[in-house]
């Protein structure tokens, strides 16, 4: 009797950096960061059909931006985990690419993390297995935080994760459909190996974060005390980033507007879903070619 193999599916939720401090650049060239990270309700979809040879089939509105399948982080993550777990059963991945590429919301990293979760499920591996987290770190700096896809403070080069319960936030995310390569933004930041960022010490004094159930105003005040150190260099690479932030900040009901990651996606937090939806509709009407999403961050 032929065994029926059931396909497994995961959502690869977009990552949003509510704050992002660049502490400095290590002597090995990696940048030390501290960032409050949350996840949006928009996502790519990833499915694994266990038992097949390792492969990737990509579709969706952003598929042409992905490049060759062999370079996709899904395949990279699977191969790295296979190196660490002898006898790992892989399979055929199907990616539904919905999120913008090179957008500062960890689309590729979220896809890779979803692949690791799928392989963990199909092989009986715990998500906190050191081998899985090692594969995540080797795949990319944003992959470890995307494995759990839970709000946290991310430190180091992405491997230090401290849970930070946040309330559900109404938000609008906007990408002007321009790519902002991370390497170009860090190059514009201009730190040399071993150099600290101006005005930042080795230890960043984090604010006393409110309780999850605290009034929204307390959270906005705490988040407003932070910054994204990559905003200024991203504006040098793509000036439209500044236009997007200004547009979001000017929307009725916007409480905080900022860039996520290394850009070009920016976000604004609103006091209600209705205000966020109205703002998103207005922005989409004015800029029909932009990617605009009204939803929640958590």
From Swiss-Prot:
<keyword id="KW-0067">ATP-binding</keyword>
<dbReference type="Pfam" id="PF00288">
    <property type="entry name" value="GHMP_kinases_N"/>
</dbReference>
<keyword id="KW-0808">Transferase</keyword>
<feature type="active site">
    <location>
        <position position="142"/>
    </location>
</feature>
<keyword id="KW-0547">Nucleotide-binding</keyword>
<feature type="binding site">
    <location>
        <begin position="100"/>
        <end position="110"/>
    </location>
    <ligand>
        <name>ATP</name>
    </ligand>
</feature>
<dbReference type="InterPro" id="IPR013750">
    <property type="entry name" value="GHMP_kinase_C_dom"/>
</dbReference>
<dbReference type="GO" id="GO:0050515">
    <property type="term" value="F:4-(cytidine 5'-diphospho)-2-C-methyl-D-erythritol kinase activity"/>
</dbReference>
<dbReference type="InterPro" id="IPR036554">
    <property type="entry name" value="GHMP_kinase_C_sf"/>
</dbReference>
<comment type="function">
    <text>Catalyzes the phosphorylation of the position 2 hydroxy group of 4-diphosphocytidyl-2C-methyl-D-erythritol.</text>
</comment>
<protein>
    <recommendedName>
        <fullName>4-diphosphocytidyl-2-C-methyl-D-erythritol kinase</fullName>
        <ecNumber>2.7.1.148</ecNumber>
    </recommendedName>
</protein>
<dbReference type="GO" id="GO:0005524">
    <property type="term" value="F:ATP binding"/>
</dbReference>
<dbReference type="InterPro" id="IPR004424">
    <property type="entry name" value="IspE"/>
</dbReference>
<dbReference type="Pfam" id="PF08544">
    <property type="entry name" value="GHMP_kinases_C"/>
</dbReference>
<comment type="pathway">
    <text>Isoprenoid biosynthesis; isopentenyl diphosphate biosynthesis via DXP pathway; isopentenyl diphosphate from 1-deoxy-D-xylulose 5-phosphate: step 3/6.</text>
</comment>
<keyword id="KW-0418">Kinase</keyword>
<dbReference type="InterPro" id="IPR020568">
    <property type="entry name" value="Ribosomal_Su5_D2-typ_SF"/>
</dbReference>
<dbReference type="InterPro" id="IPR014721">
    <property type="entry name" value="Ribsml_uS5_D2-typ_fold_subgr"/>
</dbReference>
<dbReference type="GO" id="GO:0016114">
    <property type="term" value="P:terpenoid biosynthetic process"/>
</dbReference>
<comment type="similarity">
    <text>Belongs to the GHMP kinase family. IspE subfamily.</text>
</comment>
<keyword id="KW-0414">Isoprene biosynthesis</keyword>
<dbReference type="GO" id="GO:0019288">
    <property type="term" value="P:isopentenyl diphosphate biosynthetic process, methylerythritol 4-phosphate pathway"/>
</dbReference>
<feature type="active site">
    <location>
        <position position="15"/>
    </location>
</feature>
<dbReference type="InterPro" id="IPR006204">
    <property type="entry name" value="GHMP_kinase_N_dom"/>
</dbReference>
